[in-house]
Design a protein with these regions (language model features):
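A conserved beta-strand element that flanks and buttresses the S-adenosyl-L-methionine
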Residues: 9
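Class I (Rossmann-like) S-adenosyl-L-methionine-dependent methyltransferase catalytic domain
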Residues: 1, 39-120
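Alpha-helix termination/capping residues and helix-transition junctions
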Residues: 2, 31-32
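Short glycine-dipeptide loop
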Residues: 33-39
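A short, conserved alpha-helix within the catalytic core of class I
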Residues: 16-29
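Active-site micro-motifs of SAM-dependent methyltransferase domains
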Residues: 15-16, 45
Length: 120
């Protein structure tokens, strides 16, 4: 029997993944290994991608040269909503509330929870 964990947490790594297919595989693994909630923190917001790069280029005019080949993956919330629907999970999104963290306006957190089993 494979051990299950109370929950799973990912903090600040999803934007380093090569594509959404890989992210999907990771979430499937997180779901398989848990019996409780899943939290994915520091997800780069696709609706703020242009703002993110404009801000970075303002801080570092040579940003594109300095970070060439170090791509970031930005996610639409619908990606996580589809995953939740497929697996009967509830999903919620929260802005990152971390005073002084320059990246906070460009990211959000995702929380999946399993539906409570009904006891009649």
């Amino acid at each position: 029997r494979e051990e299950k964990y109370d929950g799973a947490l990912s903090d600040g790594v999803f934007h380093y993944f090569p594509n959404e297919a890989y992210a999907q595989e990771v979430m499937e693994g997180m779901l398989e290994k848990t019996r409780g909630n899943i939290a994915i923190l520091d997800v780069h917001d696709a609706t703020k991608e242009e703002e993110f790069f404009a801000f970075r280029r303002q801080l570092d005019p040579d940003y594109d040269e300095h970070y060439r080949g170090l791509n970031k993956l930005f996610y639409d919330r619908s990606f996580f909503e589809k995953f939740a629907k497929k697996h009967g999970l509830t999903v919620s999104f929260n802005p990152l509330a971390l005073d002084g963290y320059w990246n906070a306006p460009f990211v959000y957190s995702v929380f999946f929870s399993r539906e409570a089993e009904r006891k009649d």
